[in-house]
Structure formats: C-alpha cells, structure tokens
Design a protein with these regions (language model features):
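Alpha-helical packing segments of well-folded alpha/beta enzyme cores
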Residues: 9-20, 55, 59, 167-170, ...
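Substrate-binding/active-site clefts of carbohydrate-active enzymes
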Residues: 1-48
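A short, structured beta-strand-centered segment in the mid-to-C-terminal lobe
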Residues: 2-3, 7-10, 206-216
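Conserved alpha/beta catalytic core and glycan-binding cleft of carbohydrate-active enzymes
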Residues: 25-27, 39-198, 205, 223-232
Length: 233
C-alpha cells in the first residue's frame, strides 16, 4: 500500500490521475478495493487510516474541479459510510460506488434453475434495502469476463438458446433497476469467449441471427433507458 502521509506520494497519485483524465480523456476512474486503503491493512478491526481518507477527499475534490464531467467510482464491499457524499458533507466525494453485492446476487439468481428461484427471490430484492445509502453503479464489468469466470451469457442457466432468453431478462432487470449501468464490451452481443486483451472482440458472431437479435435488443433497451430520465438519473 502507498503511504498517504507523505507529500510526494500524494502528489504522484494525484498527478497520475489528473494526467489520465487530462491527456487521455478517460470517461472516469475507478479506485479498486478502497477498503484496503481506508482501513489499516484492509482490516476494519484495526481502524480507519485518517491519512488515506483525507487524501481521497482532497484528490476527488480536485479532480472534480478540473474534470467536472469525469466519473469517479469507488469499488468497495464494506459498509464504510458516505462513499458518494460530497466532501463538503464529510463524504469521500466519489460519484458512484461499485455495487458488488447487486452484481453477485443477480448473477447467482440467473444461473439458478427457474424452478428453484422461488427460494432465492431475496437475491433480487435485497439490494433495495441499502440502495439509497449511496449512489450506486451496477457493473457487468471486465472482472466478470476473465480468468475462467465465464462471460455473462455463459453464466445464464440453460442451453444455447435458453441462455439468450435468460440474458434478455437479466438486462431488462438491470436497466429498470435504480443505478448507473456499466456493461463490458462483448456482453452486448452475447460473446461466449472470455476477454483477451491481445485479441479484438468476436465481431463475426453477429452474422448468427441469435447474436444479431440480442445485439439489437440491447441497443433498443439502451435507447429506452437513455430517453427516459427516470431510468438513468
């Protein structure tokens, strides 16, 4: 871990983040596993690292002033409060919190056989018990498409055709659930091969009617989501 008590460390990280947004025009930045930094050694029992908390607040406030359209996202699975509250209200100042709980519960539900789902409905409803504590982002990200985890379409229950039907239901649920949406490339046309940074996506599968139809479906519901303020605010 970085020693955020040192000025040179803070300067290096802040300058790097600003450089990525300024020169490469990234849409935003995700800070990975922030609990490892917020708590000493990543252990809540050891208490909060005040140097790190102060650093995150100052960095986020500065980045938002310089890059007001960039999204600053925190990946965190703990209950540390005010992740997305403004710094002025003693928050960390992130725009969104990566909702790992929603992602894991949702994917578990859709890989469960339909006749068993009546015993797992809480996986769809639990997110609303905490959802308004923060501003959440719903992620189907690169993390779920690498290292033998299988792609989103592969995770669905059923045979080849059933997986596409399940995946349509999955995305309709995602797009109508409160929160910002994030969908990793390849998911939108049902790619079965995991992501490989050394290869481009398997665009040729769009010649198959079932993949092409799924791609058009995602395009259509994305348009509906973007055109209706209640679905994307």
């Amino acid at each position: 871990n970085f020693n955020h008590a040192k000025g040179e460390t803070r300067s290096f990280i802040q300058s790097s983040a600003n450089f990525w947004l300024d020169k490469f025009h990234f849409d935003g930045l995700r800070m990975d596993a922030i609990s490892r930094a917020i708590y000493w050694g990543g252990d809540p029992a050891r208490g909060v690292n005040g140097y790190t908390v102060e650093f995150i607040k100052n960095m986020n406030k500065g980045l938002q002033e310089r890059h007001p359209t960039a999204m600053l996202i925190a990946e965190d699975s703990t209950s540390y409060p005010k992740i997305t509250a403004p710094v002025e209200y003693d928050g960390l100042g992130f725009d969104y919190k990566w909702d790992l709980g929603w992602m894991n519960d949702t994917l578990d539900y859709f890989r469960t056989p339909p006749w068993e789902r009546c015993n797992h409905y809480h996986k769809l409803t639990f997110s609303m018990a905490y959802f308004y504590n923060e501003l959440f982002l719903l992620p189907f990200s690169h993390d779920e498409n690498v290292h033998g985890k299988a792609t989103i379409i592969q995770k669905m229950y059923g045979d080849y055709e059933e997986k596409f039907m399940q995946c349509r239901a999955l995305y309709m649920y995602m797009y109508t659930h409160p929160g910002k949406k994030l969908n990793f490339m390849g998911n939108e046309f049902g790619q079965f091969r995991e992501w490989d940074e050394n290869r481009e996506q398997d665009w040729e599968i769009l010649h198959y009617p079932i993949h092409d139809a799924f791609h058009k479906y995602i395009k259509q519901i994305s348009g509906i989501c973007c055109s209706r303020k209640a679905l994307h605010c």
